[in-house]
Amino acid sequence: MAQSKRVKAIAAAVAPGKAYAFEDAIKILKTATKAKFVESIDVAVRLGVDAKKSDQQVRGSTVLPAGTGKSVRVAVFAPAGAKADEALAAGAEAVGMDDLAEKMQAGDLSYDVVIATPDAMRVVGKLGTLLGPRGLMPNPKVGTVSANPGEAVKNAKSGQVRYRTDKAGIIHCTIGKASFDDEALKSNLQALLLDLVKAKPATSKGTYLQKVSVSSTMGPGVTVDQSSLSLK
């Protein structure tokens, strides 16, 4: 089905202004003709924050209990020794210091996540213009600067997603694949929303989780009725 027909099919099944129970929202997305690839199920969460204020920007990470359905390649900056061994044992594709930095500068950037131990940031700092624009720069707020690189690697590979409010105060994130069963997708969404609630800025006033909508890779969003979720 062409994308325009797909969008129309989903739009026709959605009543304007209506919020759907999570299971019904997912059913609408799944019953539309699938693309030739397994699509992701994405979520957009509008938060009650003023994203223009630095103290109301929300940024962090969540380990989705059912995973993301994606294979994740991880590079770790850690000095030779116990920390490097820990990262390798956890499944990191590459571990190093200056040698790893040189490989990246030479064009080896085939990684989805870059992790660093605190004492390795002196090396990583030199790669800011290379890693920053690609969203790969390690940051303690999302767990990618860690004194426990083995744990950080396991989190990245087991379904960790990172989020950050955009200019409109909206979080965009993947919660799995269309091939996941409804309960897996629901548990992932609930885990994300619970972490967002924990990250609520102290200066945020009024309703915090203002709107939650789900969509498939090539489809429009369907608003989710938050009362159909367990957020306690």
Swiss-Prot record:
CDD domains (alphabetical): Ribosomal_L1
One Gene Ontology cellular component annotation held by this UniProt entry: cytosolic large ribosomal subunit
GO biological process: regulation of translation; translation
Database matches in PROSITE patterns: RIBOSOMAL_L1
Entry GO MF terms: rRNA binding; structural constituent of ribosome; tRNA binding
The keyword Transcription belongs to this UniProt entry's keyword annotation: no
Superkingdom of source: Bacteria
Keywords assigned: Repressor, Ribonucleoprotein, Ribosomal protein, RNA-binding, rRNA-binding, Translation regulation, tRNA-binding
Pfam family, one: Ribosomal_L1
Cited NCBIfam families: rplA_bact
Family statement: Belongs to the universal ribosomal protein uL1 family.
Record PANTHER family: 54S RIBOSOMAL PROTEIN L1, MITOCHONDRIAL, LARGE RIBOSOMAL SUBUNIT PROTEIN UL1M
Its biological purpose: Binds directly to 23S rRNA. The L1 stalk is quite mobile in the ribosome, and is involved in E site tRNA release.
SUBUNIT field: Part of the 50S ribosomal subunit.
Record's protein name: Large ribosomal subunit protein uL1
Gene responsible for this protein: rplA
